[in-house]
Amino acid sequence: MLFHGITGGHIQGIMEEMERRSKSADNRLAKTIQVNGRETRMPPLSPEKPTLCAGCGGKISDRYYLLAVDKQWHLRCLKCCECKLALESELTCFAKDGSIYCKEDYYRRFSVQRCARCHLGISASEIVMRARESVYHLSCFTCTTCNKTLSTGDHFGMKENLVYRRAHFELLVQGDFHSQLNYTELSAKGGGLSALPYFTNGTGAVQKGRPRKRKSPALGVDIINYTSGCNENDTDLDRDQSYPPSQKTKRMRTSFKHHQLRTTKSYFAINHNPDAKDLKQLAQKTGLTKRVLQVWFQNARAKFRRNLLRQENGGGDKVEGPSLSAPASTDSAALTPTGAASTLSDLTSPSLNVGASVTPNMDSHESGSPSQTTLTNLF
């Protein structure tokens, strides 16, 4: 440093002032470090009070030291207790129960988010797969059946936090007879995956949103034939659901009480094919729905035809079942008010005997319907 035009006394005074300011700056100099996300300024050492290192327990005589968790550390002593990584150059460190951890080891041991497959911790910087409320490692997001890794755009199903590919999930729900297949579609957003439910429409295409109910032919339900060997107190119905054609459906069984079965059999002896108004009154009388009654009468007609053919082919075999009585013709006495009143008394009698003769002409009684007087008197 050159001084021109200044006397020696002034130069000596300037040098002393610069030295004094340099010592003052050294005393105020400190090093900062973030502890658990907070920045902490390291105060300078005071020569009056010796400071002990929290790591090795020795006296700190260095010019600079580290302050973490309200304790002083040598630069070389602040290390992760797991991997022994020196933290003097790290921006953050974490403390738990008096131990110091680096960021990776802290998240690995004490992370709140855990993989739903391997149950290990997930680092905050790690890319994950999300499905519903569960989080998975990329390597753990695989099909439970075949262990194939699922990627963005693949369809999958979930059951009890277990992931299945679409084909395997279909086989799974076929065994459980689920009413709907709830798949999940992957879409990459924000490093994770969002779950979108969809439904199959039976043609291999994907139908988004709420599935439409298909219109069933005839009565709106698939009728299961009423065989002669089945229980007469039960009727089988197919669930009216949007199943794919190849998927097996579960039958819903309806049990009839004695008075319900007695009433339907007695009316079947009068008319094999009741209309909508008759079914409504039958439903009010028996407590059954019109849909169940429709299926019962259709099954009873099918059983009647089979027994009739068996009787004709077998040469006079005895016709079984109380529902095999043919309805009387429209001009018979059964449709008069007197005959209807007699039928009503038979309905309320516990010892009902329906033993009417079988009329082989089936076309005439299926197209006809009993008169209003007969149905009113019947109930």
From Swiss-Prot:
Main location: nucleus
Presence of keyword DNA-binding: yes
Source organism superkingdom: Eukaryota
Cellular component annotations (GO), alphabetically ordered: nucleus
Ranges of biased composition (kind: Basic residues): 248-257
Protein name: LIM/homeobox protein Lhx9
GO molecular function, one term: DNA-binding transcription factor activity, RNA polymerase II-specific
Residue ranges: DNA binding: 249-308
Tissue and organ distribution: Isoform 1 and isoform 3 are expressed in ovary, testis, brain and heart. Isoform 4 and isoform 5 are expressed in brain.
Domain LIM zinc-binding residues, every copy: 51-112, 113-175
CDD domains, A to Z: homeodomain, LIM1_Lhx2_Lhx9, LIM2_Lhx2_Lhx9
Alphabetized Pfam families for the sequence: Homeodomain, LIM
Function (record text): May be involved in gonadal development.
Entries under SUPFAM superfamilies matching the protein: Glucocorticoid receptor-like (DNA-binding domain), Homeodomain-like
InterPro entries: HD (IPR001356), Homeobox_CS (IPR017970), Homeodomain-like_sf (IPR009057), LIM_Homeobox_TF (IPR050453), Znf_LIM (IPR001781)
Gene3D superfamilies: Cysteine Rich Protein (2.10.110.10), Homeodomain-like (1.10.10.60)
UniProt keyword annotation of Membrane present: no
Region (Disordered): 232-257, 310-379
Record's keyword terms, sorted: DNA-binding, Homeobox, LIM domain, Metal-binding, Nucleus, Repeat, Zinc
Bias (Polar residues) ranges: 326-379
Localization in the cell: Nucleus
Upper classification of the organism: Eukaryota, Metazoa, Chordata, Craniata, Vertebrata
Alphabetical GO biological process terms: dorsal spinal cord interneuron anterior axon guidance; negative regulation of DNA-templated transcription
